Amino acid sequence: MQMLADQYVMQGEMRGDLVKTTFYTDKNLRQLANFSATTENKYDSAYVYYRVINNCNYYIAHCDTNQYNGSTNVVIDKYIAAKATRAWAYLQLGRNYERVPFFTEPLTQISQIDRDYPELGLPELVAQLAPDLEQYSAQPVPTLGININAIRTNGSPNWESAAKGFSPSRCFIPVDVVLGDMYLEAGNYDAAARHFVTYFTKVAWKEDLTSSYTALMRPKSTVSGAGGRMMDDDLPSYNQYTDEVTGMDWSTIFSRNNILDIVSYIPMAPSAQNGTTTNVPLIFGFNYYATSEEKTRTQPYVDEIQLLPSDYLNTLSDSTEYYYYASHTNQTNMYDSVRISTAGDMRLRSVIHQEASGDTAIQWIDKYKYAQILLYRNSTIWLRLAEAFNRLGMTDAAFLILKDGIGEFVLGTYADGSPWVSYLSDETRQALQTTYPLLSTENIELFPNSRAFGIHTHGAGKAASDYPGGKQPGGITYNTGKSPYQLDRMVGLKMQELADAYGVAVGTTKQDTINAIEDMICDELALETAFEGNRWYDLKRMATHKNESGIYGGNFGGRWLARKLAFKQPVVNLEDKNNWYLPFK
């Protein structure tokens, strides 16, 4: 897996809309960015995925699954993990190449390579792999005999003495996450949602489900996406607003040896002497493998930055509403008023390191400064579940994940029997207890009120509602109306944005709402998971689903995708889905 790590990130991000090239950008990255990559491009290699697949094939073919220690099967978890990893690797091939050779036998002789294996597209790959994986649903990943929270150290980088560690269990991918991802790509939204729910209720580390993050903001000291400082009128002075959310700073997810929120990752070695290294940190301007002599700053940042946040991402971050409690001298309850600030979303800013250089400012993206290649985070999976719910027509459930998160409060009612969460339908509330049983009698204790956070609150402040027993200081009664981040309002704003951008007649049908919320989820994925290797696949998947829905004419998905990426000046017409794939080699 370490051999494919750099390619995974660059294939996923360079063709997306969240990074831009610089004077120092490698030509291979430039070619990916403008869709001119040929089979000579060093980041276009199906081989690195097939190498993983063949290793898995070999293990699966030769593993004796009847090995027991007493009544405990001591190998089945690793056997399942090999099948999940193989499916994940095929999923990446299906995303990047239109059709790929498919085989499940181990290739041990050169003569086997020339066999006429069937070439399958992504839907056929899912059809081949998913039925076998279904029998392993709800199975945990291997722990290799150590505590799931345990960190093993693997040496230190040359420029610092602090040891780098990794979590062995997080080097595997839960089978339900792979199944959910495959079904979502294939447009089987019900199966995708069921498997994501199974992951959260049967597999996920329970402490992760109750971890809260917020990019906690301090006025007039937070770097804006454009490199300047927030003006005085962007937010009231500190004594005029209240910190309404608690929890760990969101950027700690990407800190040294963190495991919270991380489901699966590829930890890279701290030095060449310790194993396989990665070039990803250096591409973003951080020389993780510098010697102490090469460290010219407090940390080994370099001036030759190859990738920066795109103007689109900076604009999205800066234009996102930030919500805060306003307090007044004569106000009885300082938590009655939630206001909108022009300060923007805090997540991008919390992973940007900035230093002055003369009259300009230099910015570095810090997500990779500890050489961890993230594959899945719980936050990512919640957003994929929101995407599936939305396409199932459960638009309110999708918004719940953005605004409030999943918690017992969803089932709460006032004395007169009316629900606390007024924007949820009775049908959705019932589905969350039965069909997608996050809040069934068996599972509801996994999601306590006090630790429920909507994903949007990670960076946008007081987007959530208040509820009895909740984390908010003003949570005496449940009130969905305090924060301006409301379902109807946000959908209306997004509909107007789409109408203006694409010149389409946006109506008030269910499909119009689904499309608008899908774009809201797309924005949230940008703010939450930027630079993690997902973006091209998110855009491509959503464009495909828009086309399949038939909304706004025959090829709205293609037009939507092409417009988002027009700033990259692609050399091909991205309205044509045939141009969405890399040349296979």
What is the role of each PLM region?
Residues Y49, N154-S167, V263, P267, ...:
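Long, intrinsically disordered, low-complexity segments
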Residues K20-V100, D116-A127, L133-E134, A138-P140, ...:
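Conserved, well-structured interaction surfaces
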Residues E40, T201-S418, Y423-T428, A463, ...:
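Elongated scaffold/linker segments in the mid-to-C-terminal portions of large proteins
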Residues M1-K20, N573-K585:
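Acidic, glycine-rich segments characteristic of secretory precursors and extracytoplasmic regions
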